[in-house]
């Protein structure tokens, strides 16, 4: 009888390497949105990847200087605002860019101070402008910022030293400030300067 030959299974000479998984591209980080789906960044604008140091000459006066003006308006005492029983006369310091014209419309930036401060802290006064105003002037003049209006108000209530009282300032005045901002300050600003608001009603300001 013939001897059966053993069956030999062919084996590859080289063990194949595992297929490398392609590196996945990270998904773009979604910008946080507010309740209306707004990100606060225009579609054609890019957020810089790093902060830029302010050039030293920006702290000196620019050739093209914006102006500071006082805006006086009426509001009500913060703690009893809803009763509207005690009127207050307040002011905000407003920055108007170089070449401001009523024939053009401007965006408005509301810039609030912190503790132990007031409406003059950021930009100074018309008589004594602060150094930070120079920075804004240069940035606008160099095209790094579009011409815009800055409004510096204060949440100080009945005393210029209110912001130095931590309990009063951060426990009451800043919490209540939205009443004054929405009902009194913004309408005063939008009704005085050339902005994108159609009128000073809540619908017009939106």
Summary of predicted features, one role per range:
Residues 31-206:
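Non-catalytic cap/lid and distal C-terminal segments of serine-dependent acyl enzymes
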Residues 1-51:
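Intrinsically disordered, low-complexity repeat and linker tracts
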């Amino acid at each position: 009888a013939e001897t059966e030959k053993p069956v030999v299974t062919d084996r590859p000479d080289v063990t194949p390497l595992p297929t490398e998984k392609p590196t996945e591209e990270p998904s773009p980080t979604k910008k946080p949105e507010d309740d209306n789906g707004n990100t606060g960044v225009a579609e054609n604008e890019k957020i810089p990847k790093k902060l830029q140091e302010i050039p030293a000459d920006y702290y000196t006066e620019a050739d093209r200087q914006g102006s500071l003006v006082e805006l006086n308006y009426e509001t009500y005492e913060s703690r009893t605002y809803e009763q509207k029983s005690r009127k207050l006369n307040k002011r905000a310091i407003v920055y108007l860019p170089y070449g401001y014209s009523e024939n053009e419309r401007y965006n408005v930036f509301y810039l609030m101070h912190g503790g132990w401060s007031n409406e003059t802290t950021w930009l100074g006064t018309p008589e004594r402008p602060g150094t930070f105003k120079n920075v804004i002037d240069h940035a606008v003049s160099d095209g790094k910022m579009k011409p815009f209006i800055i409004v510096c108000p204060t949440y100080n209530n009945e005393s210029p030293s209110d912001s130095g009282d931590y309990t009063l300032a951060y426990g009451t005045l800043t919490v209540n400030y939205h009443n004054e901002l929405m009902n009194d300050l913004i309408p005063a600003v939008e009704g005085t300067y050339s902005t994108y608001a159609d009128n000073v009603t809540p619908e017009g300001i939106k």
